[in-house]
Design a protein with these regions (language model features):
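Phosphate-coordinating loops and pocket residues in cytosolic domains that bind phosphorylated ligands
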Residues: 10, 50, 82
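Short acidic-hydrophobic surface loop/beta-edge motif
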Residues: 88-94
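Signal for well-folded cores of large energy- and translation-related assemblies
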Residues: 39, 53, 81-84
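Cell-wall glycan
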Residues: 6-7, 74-85
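Well-structured core secondary-structure elements of compact alpha/beta domains
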Residues: 1-40, 56-71, 101-105
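Short, well-ordered alpha-helical segments enriched in acidic and aromatic residues
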Residues: 45-54
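Glycine-centered tight-turn and secondary-structure capping sites
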Residues: 41-46, 86
Length: 105
């Protein structure tokens, strides 16, 4: 199945690789705050990605483009499939960190 999404990756000290000193609980808290700001219109998803994401996709506002679900870790693909197009799902935890996912296709 092909999916299209944008995401914000929030790293934490137990992620692979551990590129941040915060714990997973704080990363989840930051994710919830960002989702709230984005949904209230106070911050665009693209701006939040550029300012907060640990993924190189931040340069594209978090845009991952189209991908086969098998190309992503199972946690990410499963979460993405449960999000309606143009919506943002709840924070998703994977070995890479905490993801904020917006399904775009």
């Amino acid at each position: 199945m092909k999916l299209k999404a944008s995401h914000i990756l929030l790293s934490h000290k137990d992620a692979n690789p551990p590129t941040h000193t915060r714990g997973i609980a704080l990363a989840m808290n930051v994710a919830e705050q960002l989702i709230s700001e984005i949904k209230s219109g106070g911050l665009s998803f693209e701006q939040a990605a550029r300012e907060n994401s640990a993924c190189p996709s931040k340069e594209r506002g978090g845009d991952l483009g189209w991908f086969e679900e098998e190309a992503m870790v199972i946690e990410f693909s499963a979460a993405c499939k449960n999000i309606q197009k143009d919506d943002i799902g709840p924070p998703c935890i994977s070995p890479f960190g905490v993801h904020i996912i917006m399904r775009t296709g």
